[in-house]
Curated annotation (Swiss-Prot):
Its EC number is 3.4.21.-. Expressed by the venom gland. The lineage of its organism: Eukaryota, Metazoa, Chordata, Craniata, Vertebrata. This is Snake venom serine protease BITS01A. InterPro entries: Peptidase_S1_PA (IPR009003), Peptidase_S1_PA_chymotrypsin (IPR043504), Peptidase_S1A (IPR001314), Trypsin_dom (IPR001254), TRYPSIN_HIS (IPR018114), TRYPSIN_SER (IPR033116).
Amino acid sequence: MVLIRVIANLLILQVSYAQKSSELVVGGDECDINEHPFLAFLYSHGYFCGLTLINQEWVLTAAHCDRRFMRIYLGIHARSVANDDEVIRYPKEKFICPNKNMSDEKDKDIMLIRLNRPVKNSTHIAPISLPSNPPSVGSVCRVMGWGSITIPNDTYPDVPHCANINLVNDTVCRGAYKRFPAKSRTLCAGVLQGGKDTCVGDSGGPLICNGTFQGIVSWGGKVCARPRKPALYTKVFDYLPWIQSIIAGNKTATCPP
């Protein structure tokens, strides 16, 4: 596993500059090693994303993180040194909304993945519950991931970084982005004065509001952490019926329009 990690880290450094600046944690600090047992790391030939473990067999991420080959690390903190309970899994099944507009990666940016083998709860592996209610504007939200921690030049940390941001009204994001979709099941979150944001490498990771899993890192501005440029997160609550149907075995379930 050590050799795999060394090769993976070198590849990440080689290609990470080519990733879009819509996926990083800027303005944060190293996450506590015990605060993210639900956070997973997706790696594919130098490309990487975050994921969220929602039960022993299923993870959620962004649809635009989909790749042909994916290795999923659970129980991970430092990419260079494995935790004792760290495990690797692969997708057994992948589900993207069948009614998604595939020409628009912002549309229905959610993917449900069934792991090839279930994981067991341990010190650094445990699922987080799906939301029972949507979050309220003003909520304090936590973002986390292995994305770049500097702008405009990218610097990728060995360990995940965390930052607190705020859930703001959708009108802020609609005013900030000219191409904001007319129908968007997203959450708008950030720090209006700038300085903290998600961006390159954090796509697919969780948005935790008041301790509840509410969003999936989706997209944002070309340059991260700019004033009045919050990022967009897929609103997990709106997709609960689809998620629950797929897990229950209804593989033809569709997402809300």
